[in-house]
Curated annotation (Swiss-Prot):
Organism field: Chondrus crispus
Residues annotated to bind O2: 252
Pathway recorded for this protein: Energy metabolism; oxidative phosphorylation
PANTHER family according to UniProt: CYTOCHROME C OXIDASE SUBUNIT 1 (PTHR10422:SF18)
Membrane topology: Multi-pass membrane protein
Name of the featured protein: Cytochrome c oxidase subunit 1
A Pfam family per the record: COX1
Origin organism lineage: Eukaryota, Rhodophyta, Florideophyceae, Rhodymeniophycidae, Gigartinales
Length: 532
């Protein structure tokens, strides 16, 4: 018994194996996603009808729920699953490396997250919680308005989570730049690896700015400085500039790994190489660069000069160009392909469709004149949930079904996966499509009560969220069924046409399912073959 326990501790607590750490990230992300999902359910139940009922008129609690929902979903669900989970599992295998460059750094990157999560949950439970929204703007987050320790706990939580992200980013950058197998140039690495590389650079540059901003907020609250306190000569708008200089690259950090995953899936299920590989790479890099010079489009209403607003409007619209290149390249990949509509492909097509809608509403919001009336309405909520709740999350589901057999060695039941896709698709669209109409009608964000005129669309949105909830529960049932069924997965489960053998484009389909504890006993040699 003792030896089993020590083995378990050394394997899972002191792990230096990229696959085990990736598994830990996936489990952690699923747990946090459930917590965040419960909070969104509470929000939608409160908003199902006008007037106060579920939260008994306690508007502070409502804002605490919204803040915690955002932090959980962004920092503890999407980032750990995409970068930590899929990134750790797949990047070393795809580049033919035995492990990450710094395996123990990888371990601490993960183990910083559970304490960070605990601090975040504590911040919601002490005093009156953090009712500031995820942006934590002063003066609402100042010591006068949030006098308890809740905001300080949230700040510490973000510090630790940010440290985890930076360490992980350093690890990915050095792994991808230094540990590729012989014959694998940068222009031969898979698009998912490129997406993780760009994401890691974004993290490395953006997160320290957030750390600086929240550290100044911490000293404003506790040590009598006045960085953001106008009465002491500070400027609360400075905080907004610092926060959004991090916050805008952050949304690209959330979606870029998804772009990489979708490229692989669309290519596999269309039986074609990705259309315009080099263009895809340059598009991702340009999105990463442009993401840093558009931050003030979140701040059109704070009184920026008109020429400043004109610049940020133009720059924001330019980002649509590389994004459009990616979308049209995916469509060109599907075009004339031999399409197989398995669950990962359904989620990928859903991703392309819904992400495009989210991108179009983003173009609308880029206009500073229009944004004055749409700012802080449900139109903005609809926009970023189309990009995140149907972009990032659909990419996660697509990647999960695509690589599930490879990671576990067991294949999921296809019919159940398709039911999960359709129920999720209907649920999220029913939830977020009405929010566009509410926003155009002027319903403000972060307010738990609303005039009766908005009741109809809100009820529909709440019903949609209940459908999405049940489809998520169904997803966990699928995972349970898959893991308990004895349905082994072949090395390459997506071989549909047995008579003609296709080459596989990436290394993970060459190794066994699941891969050995040490994937490569010797370095693979990568070279190009001419296709007939």
């Amino acid at each position: 018994m003792q030896s089993f326990f020590t083995q378990w501790i050394s394997r899972w607590i002191f792990s230096t194996n990229h696959k085990d750490i990736g598994t830990l990230y996936l489990i952690f992300g699923a747990f946090s996603g459930v917590l965040g999902g419960c909070m969104s359910m509470l929000i939608r139940m409160e908003l199902a009808q006008p007037s106060n009922h579920l939260l008994l008129g306690n508007h502070q609690i409502y804002n605490v729920l919204i803040t915690a929902h955002a932090f959980l979903m962004i920092f503890f669900m999407v980032m750990p699953v995409m970068i930590g989970g899929f990134g750790n599992w797949l990047v070393p295998i795809m580049i033919g490396s035995p492990d990450m460059a710094f395996p123990r750094l990888n371990n601490i990157s993960f183990w910083l997250l559970p304490p960070s999560l605990c601090l975040l949950l504590m911040s919601a439970l002490v005093e009156v919680g953090v009712g500031t929204g995820w942006t934590v703007y002063p003066p609402l987050s100042s010591i006068q308005s949030h006098s308890g320790g809740a905001v300080d706990l949230a700040i510490f939580s973000l510090h630790i989570s940010g440290a985890s992200s930076i360490l992980g980013a350093v690890n990915f950058i050095s792994t991808i730049l230094n540990m590729r197998s012989p014959g694998q140039s940068m222009y031969r690495i898979p698009l998912f690896v490129w997406s993780i590389l760009v994401t890691a650079f974004l993290l490395l540059l953006a997160v320290p700015v957030l750390a600086g901003a929240i550290t100044m907020l911490l000293t404003d609250r506790n040590f009598n400085t006045s960085f953001f306190d106008a009465s002491g000569g500070g400027d609360p708008i400075l905080y907004q500039h610092l926060f959004w200089f991090f916050g805008h690259p952050e949304v690209y950090i959330l979606i870029l790994p998804g772009f990489g995953m979708i490229s692989h899936i669309v290519s596999t299920f269309s039986r074609k190489p990705v259309f315009g590989y080099i263009g895809m790479v340059y598009a991702m890099v340009s999105i990463g660069v442009l993401g840093f010079i558009v931050w003030a489009h979140h701040m059109y209403t704070v009184g920026l000069d008109v020429d400043t607003r004109a610049y940020f409007t133009a720059a924001t619209m330019i980002i649509a160009v590389p994004t459009g290149i990616k979308i049209f390249s995916w469509i060109a990949t599907i075009w004339e392909g031999s399409i197989h509509l398995k669950t990962p492909m359904l989620f990928a097509i859903g991703f392309i469709f819904l992400f495009t809608i989210g991108g179009l509403t983003g173009i609308v919001l880029a206009n500073s004149g229009l944004d004055i009336s749409l700012h802080d309405t449900y139109y903005v909520v609809a926009h970023f949930h189309y990009v995140l709740s149907m972009g990032a999350v659909f990419a996660i589901f697509a990647g999960f079904y695509y690589w599930f057999g490879k990671i576990t060695g067991l294949q999921y039941p296809e019919t159940l996966g398709q039911i999960h896709f359709w129920s999720t698709f209907i649920g999220v669209n029913l939830t977020f499509m009405p929010m566009h109409f509410l926003g155009l009608a002027g319903m403000p964000r972060r307010i738990p009560d609303y005039p009766d005129a908005y009741a109809g669309w809100n009820l529909i949105a709440s019903y949609g969220s209940y459908i999405a909830l049940f489809s998520t529960l169904f997803f966990f049932y699928i995972v349970f069924v898959s893991l308990t069924s004895n349905n082994p997965c072949t090395n390459f489960p997506w071989e549909f046409n047995k008579s003609k053998t296709y080459g596989v484009s990436t290394l993970e389909w060459i190794v066994t399912s699941p891969p050995a504890y040490h994937t490569f006993e010797e370095m693979p040699l990568i070279y190009e073959t001419k296709s007939n």
